[in-house]
Amino acid sequence: MSDMTPSEIVKKLDDYIIGQDDAKRAVAIALRNRWRRMQLDTELRQEITPKNILMIGPTGVGKTEIARRLAKLAEAPFIKVEATKFTEVGYVGKEVESIIRDLTDTAVKMVRHQAIEKMRDKAKELAQERILDILVSPARNSSGQVEGSQNTSTARQFFLEPLIKGELNEQEIEIDLAVTPVDIEIMSPPGMEEMTNQLQSMFQHMSSQKHKIRKMKIGDALKLLIDEEASKLVNPEELKQVAIHSVEQNGIVFIDEVDKICRHGSKSTSDVSREGVQRDLLPLVEGCTVSTKHGMVKTDHILFIASGAFQVAKPSDLIPELQGRFPIRVELKSLTPKDFERILTEPSASLTYQYKSLMKTEGIKIEFTKDGITSIAGAAGQVNENTENIGARRLHTILERVMEDISYNADKIKKKSITIDSKYVDTHLSKLINNEDLSRFIL
């Protein structure tokens, strides 16, 4: 778990997200409070629950990106879900408890990957031994006993060095590999999740016991054998316990479009289902125990971050109990052309840097001038204002349009250095931007 201070967390987030300082401060404090809680004694630690966050702001201003980057900084299990995908218990659709099951699956994969990486060196040695067994089969007498072990040992040493150096990578061998277990998804009726989990485990166990002889190059075989040997070195039950603990103490759930499950205006039949989803979410956010195929997971200390545009509904349209479970509210501001200029140039791996790097692979040097950046940002702001405001996502559309000719004709372009200035941008965008009907459909 990260032990960074709030200011350090905000500084890290600044590398990827422009503006929205209030939201960054809120999530930085929430993450630091997790570290503070873990320093306390066990009894007091159980009493301190996370302060869930409600982000309010239009689309494309950085709500999801803030939560996603926060989870990466914390090295925590993270899942993003859309509130509209869930239905009240008894209706057709996904139940909210599947959020925790999916989060636990993510944690198991994450912990498993970390454990395998730690065992990779040992697994590599074992994989090399298996390949040597194929290359140097020990001689056996008529009764099946191994003989000439000294000669076999000498032969293994002879092959070991070129194997380590990769000199045998192109040589083909036949190898016995375990078949990858098939991941079978079974839709379960309400209340029968435990039986579904047992059926899934049974089918996966059956397929995991199968082996198949394959012919391949030693280089490819070595990679597969390293993964197989590393998997044998880790303890699945121990991994599950570590993953469940990670979910319970460090898990982050991001619920998007929470404003779409608000009841607003006059009541209708759909409002019943919307309010039902809120009531189903309530136990998860308050703290309950959810049954997963990996074990029981308590949600008391999982951090929930909800977000929504709240253009039609208001946060007060949420049921009072759910409002009370999101005590920290931050409003994210709409982005201006000045913000777009910064987004195009300042973040790590900014959009302009990405396009420069892509074209560099074709031997073309792209240079964005300051007035060119200003024109692109202005165009994005204008289209957002005239049509639908989709925030920073508009920059992807605008830039793709600006770069279209270069991307398509990259192999034919003789001029290997291209400057994108305001004149170039206007030439490629002016017709579309000035024609509102065209910009509505194309940009």
Swiss-Prot record:
ATP binds at residues 18, 60-65, 256, 321, 393. Keywords: ATP-binding, Chaperone, Cytoplasm, Nucleotide-binding. One of its GO terms (cellular component) is HslUV protease complex. SMART domains: AAA, ClpB_D2-small. SUPFAM superfamilies: P-loop containing nucleoside triphosphate hydrolases. One of its GO terms (molecular function) is peptidase activity. One of its GO terms (biological process) is proteolysis involved in protein catabolic process. It is found in: Cytoplasm. ATPase subunit of a proteasome-like degradation complex; this subunit has chaperone activity. The binding of ATP and its subsequent hydrolysis by HslU are essential for unfolding of protein substrates subsequently hydrolyzed by HslV. HslU recognizes the N-terminal part of its protein substrates and unfolds these before they are guided to HslV for hydrolysis. PANTHER family: ATP-DEPENDENT CLP PROTEASE ATP-BINDING SUBUNIT CLPX-LIKE, MITOCHONDRIAL-RELATED, ATP-DEPENDENT PROTEASE ATPASE SUBUNIT HSLU. A double ring-shaped homohexamer of HslV is capped on each side by a ring-shaped HslU homohexamer. The assembly of the HslU/HslV complex is dependent on binding of ATP. Belongs to the ClpX chaperone family. HslU subfamily. This is ATP-dependent protease ATPase subunit HslU.
